[in-house]
């Protein structure tokens, strides 16, 4: 039988040095093309470090993306990230603006036939606004997403894999090799 799933992604926005200082200046918004949401974005124009950059989030490969820029909608009033309120619903409200506790959250629907496999790409980044659609369009091709993932893995392996140690404790080896050395 066919199954329909909702895939969610959530990111709390700081866009400054300290969230408690910067969140009042953050505005979230949606970017639409032909009345369809392409991505949710956020910007803090007063940030010395992030002022000209926009954080953005989208989910590629699903259907009917909905978004929210309100942490209280996603997590729930007094809620916790481990059990977000949004999981009780199949989509988000598309609320954005400067009056909310800022976040970028997105939901996309996925329909699966029996034994069917689908890949989705979550694109979450920060860039100048005019570059965002170019980045999203690049990763609409799943092969570009796979290549980027392999490049990131190679980068970190090359950077962190120069020294290898072997101890009697395998868990210590995992911790030391690549991260602490």
Name these PLM-found stretches.
Residues 1-3, 110-128:
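Short Pro-Gly-centered flexible turn/kink motifs
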Residues 2-90, 104-106, 132-162, 169:
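Polysaccharide-binding surfaces and accessory modules of carbohydrate-active proteins
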Residues 7, 100-102, 114-116:
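Solvent-exposed loop and beta-edge segments used for protein-protein assembly and interaction
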Residues 12-15, 127-128, 180:
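Hydrophobic/aromatic-lined pockets within catalytic cores
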Residues 90-100, 181:
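Active-site-adjacent bridging/hinge elements
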Residues 94-97, 107-112:
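Beta-strand-rich interaction surfaces with strong enrichment in secreted/lumenal proteins
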Residues 129-130, 176:
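Short amphipathic alpha-helical leader/targeting segments
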Residues 161-181:
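Extended glycan-interaction surfaces of carbohydrate-active proteins
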């Amino acid at each position: 039988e066919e199954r329909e799933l909702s895939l969610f992604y959530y990111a709390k926005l700081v866009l400054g040095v300290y969230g408690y200082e910067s969140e009042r200046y953050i505005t979230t918004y949606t970017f639409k093309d032909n009345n369809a949401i392409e991505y949710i974005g956020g910007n803090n124009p007063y940030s010395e470090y992030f002022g000209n950059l926009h954080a953005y989030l989208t989910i590629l490969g699903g259907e009917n993306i909905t978004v929210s820029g309100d942490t209280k909608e996603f997590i729930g009033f007094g809620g916790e990230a481990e059990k977000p309120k949004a999981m009780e619903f199949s989509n988000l409200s598309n609320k954005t603006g400067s009056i909310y506790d800022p976040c970028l959250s997105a939901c996309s629907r996925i329909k699966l036939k029996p034994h069917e496999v689908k890949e989705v790409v979550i694109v979450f980044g920060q860039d100048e606004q005019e570059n965002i659609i170019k980045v999203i369009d690049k990763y609409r091709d799943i092969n570009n997403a796979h290549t980027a993932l392999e490049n990131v893995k190679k980068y970190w392996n090359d950077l962190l894999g120069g020294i290898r140690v072997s101890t009697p404790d395998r868990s210590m080896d995992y911790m030391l090799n690549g991260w602490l050395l």
